[in-house]
């Protein structure tokens, strides 16, 4: 749910900033992929080449503020809970999605009635719960992968004083 607020929804903080406020990208999207013992976090932001450095700095600032200096508030909590609950019926629209939920229950050791409890679990989320989750998403252990015209992008990255490793396309 915290990821939805950061970059998982079209109304997420990152999308509203980079796309709507600044106009540097068609969209920003993030996802936290649940696998056993890990939670890989991916963020995609195809931005204008001339704004690569600015966008990277803005995204890093938004992520640093997420759950800390700009914590998730009750309005955001209500939005993500409502979205989560309303999206539940769509998660079981076909046999494949039902099978996927059964498989995930087995993989993660969940009870067979886990899906029946999801609406209540969403509704029980507090802003404190979401802010704790936000800190896990944005703990700073990030690897940034930037793809673009090196002549145009590298000087922008140099201004950010981030370590850069250049790999050329095969």
Residue ranges with predicted function:
Residues 1-11:
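His/Glu-based metal-binding/catalytic segments typifying zinc-dependent metallopeptidases
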Residues 3-4, 15-68, 74-127, 139-147:
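M16 family metallopeptidases and their MPP-like homologs
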Residues 8, 33-35, 134:
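Generic marker of residues within folded, mature protein domains
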Residues 11-12, 150:
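Generic non-transmembrane alpha-helix signal with a bias for helix starts/N-cap capping motifs
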Residues 127-170:
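Proteolytic maturation boundary segments
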């Amino acid at each position: 749910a915290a990821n939805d607020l950061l970059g998982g929804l079209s109304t997420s903080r990152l999308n509203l900033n980079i796309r709507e406020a600044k106009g540097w990208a068609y969209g920003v999207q993030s996802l936290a992929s649940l696998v056993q013992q890990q939670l890989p976090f991916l963020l995609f932001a195809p931005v204008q080449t001339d704004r690569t450095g600015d966008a990277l700095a803005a995204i890093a600032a938004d992520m640093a503020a997420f759950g800390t200096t700009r914590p998730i508030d009750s309005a955001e909590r209500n939005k993500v809970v409502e979205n989560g609950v309303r999206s539940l019926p769509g998660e079981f629209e076909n046999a494949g999605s039902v099978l996927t939920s059964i498989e995930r229950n087995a993989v993660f050791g969940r009870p067979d009635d886990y899906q029946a409890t999801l609406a209540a679990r969403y509704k029980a989320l507090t802003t404190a719960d979401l802010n704790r989750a936000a800190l896990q998403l944005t703990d700073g252990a990030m690897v940034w992968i930037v793809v673009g015209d090196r002549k145009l992008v590298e000087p922008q990255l140099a201004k950010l004083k981030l370590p850069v490793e250049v790999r050329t396309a095969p």
